[in-house]
């Protein structure tokens, strides 16, 4: 095999018009090695046992800058689109002219325009393929294509046309979509946009997840309003784009409470760590973020991160408690117990008001039983939540509950309205469980509920020795606390049921009651006892 390439390229070979046979001279012009005859058959060129497709031959010819006459023949052997594409790739305007001369009516080939790197060739190619006869339509088509395929020189050349016909914004949208960074910067700085929306570039960057677009938006000579940057930071938090958030934070240096709150809510621990390391946010802001983290059911690591940043003496804000209740976040309670000022009693109080049984049940692990029941029943009474009251009393020991409510009633001395509710709940509970009457009588006498006391006595078995003893005790309570009506009612009730033998002891009890009244200087009670003794002395003596 030997090469005839150099010698062959020195001669111009005219291909026969029918182009039915590819001779050795043509092969030499193409820059190939010749070692035998070659024949064109349909779309394949045969060289003995070697096969070259027409496309390969054309591509090779263009690469070796073969004679135009040869190339003109080859472009007839391939599809027009392929021929155009290869001509664009090799920046051959002469080949394009040849193809267009063969194909006077060509379909739209906009999709291959980008194959050329030459601005001149791009415009020339567009001139042939654009079908519109209207100048403005052709120009707009060219500019859209130039934007689509990143030809800034064409846009700069036609800058005045873009401004005059107000097509800058639509072209800018294409540049953003295609991520042409230099074009985007040109649109913003060239003054071709009618109304530039500051958020457009940011929104596109987030939509496409393109960090380079965000960098362009940040580096443009534009003063963005704070609300826009905050909004973009929130978007970065929601999408968990850490790089985007860090770029916005470091570039614009904007810190707001809503940012750390959102980061906590969406459980973005890396972003939270970045924010907290700046030492910008105070305890209140961190507490608000903690509340948001509870609301969003953030991970334990996120909660611990926020808790570790708090001052141990910082008072826990109500929003933290309300978030636990409202969003039923039980898992965070053990973690919050690390904060010295976190009060489980406050949490239970709010849970009772919110009727959140799950939270109340979860608090059992952190309080003694007596404290828990006292607190829950008290709050149920205060909030008039009889359903909760019944839930926590129906399965417990009745006397334990009775004793607990009795203690609650004693604590509500200064709250007469609430105390009255507690007494009513106690009476209902006493009636439902059919407890002994004596403890209830003592409680009613202790707190001077005369009407309920009378009703209870009326329902009691007055001949029962326990009831009699209870009424005598009630005499002492009444004299000690100056409850004249209670004393008078107990006195009259006992006279009716006591035997003659018992009346002597009763008289001694009345005398002792008078001494108690004297000790506490209850003059009204003393006068009452004296009058009762005088009035009923004959009964007592009998």
Curated annotation (Swiss-Prot):
Induction of synthesis: Expressed in the early phase of the viral replicative cycle.
Stretch forming the signal peptide: none
Family listed: Belongs to the asfivirus MGF 505 family.
Key words of the record: Early protein
Function (record text): Plays a role in virus cell tropism, and may be required for efficient virus replication in macrophages.
Protein's name according to its UniProt entry: Protein MGF 505-11L
Membrane-spanning parts: none
